[in-house]
Amino acid sequence: MHYSTISGVSDNEKLELFLVLLLNFYVTISPISKIGLFIERKENGMAETRKLYYENGACLQFCATVLSCVPTDGNFAVTLDATAFYPEGGGQPADRGALGGARVLDVHEKDGVVVHTVTAPLHVGEVVQGDVDGRRRLDHMQQHTGEHIVSGIVHAQFGYDNVGFHIGAQDVTVDFSGPLTDAELADVERAANWVIWQNAPVTIAWPAPSELAQLNYRSKKELTGAIRIVTVANVDVCACCGTHVERCGQVGSIKLTSAQSYKGGTRVTMLCGDRKSTRLNSSHITRSRMPSSA
């Protein structure tokens, strides 16, 4: 029923009556239906989630208001007005942790809205605390910044582009657009660790379109709109949506573990930070027999 079809009252009275009926319908339908209406409005242009992980990559604990909660495959899809949970994207996996006492199993983004898959329902309108798994976040930051260091060096020395990047559970793979010999990769590794020892700063910026047009940056130049630029001082300038450490020293160290020809270029497997220390140190432990006493 449209309010214009109501007879015997003025147009203003028709509109007021229609709004009362609509409000009465909304407050009497089931909570799940309310959520459905809310999500439909959200997907049709409501405000994007405030992304705390962009404001401060070290933010691991926060409070936010629950905007929606929908059952999905035995779990619940939750949206908030703000979040520090990084959603999967740009080759980087999603954060894990806890939200309002529920475990966060996955995080993804759609049309600027970050959706958290959690193990228990949360109440719409409730303010909840989020706790991001700090060890996992730091690991991803180390791997991602390490990749930028290596990719920046390869681009500067050989002119190759990074055409593929993935942080896996065990290894990081980077695909370059040209061939690289073992000797060249050894030089790249040494140069990358030198950058780490120099503790070069890593900065984030959102340049205005006029500034961006003058900026010589690597990767994703086809993107439009607000572009996030990650700069490793004197090494790399790249458009990127991932989380990063503040200084290269926090990467710890880099090891290029293998390389293979791939689609006319080179796929490099690498380890950074704690992954490198744990994996390589554990595989090179030797035991010395204690001398027997006389």
Model-derived features: positions:
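Short, positively charged and aromatic/hydrophobic N-terminal segments
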Residues: T5, L23-F38
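Alpha-helical and His/Cys-centered functional microenvironments
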Residues: I6, I35, S151-G152, S288
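Charged/polar low-complexity intrinsically disordered segments
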Residues: E13, P31-K34, E43
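Cationic, low-complexity basic patches in intrinsically disordered or flexible, solvent-exposed regions
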Residues: L15-L17
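A glycine- and charged-residue-rich anion-binding loop/surface
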Residues: G45-R279, S283, R287, S293-A294
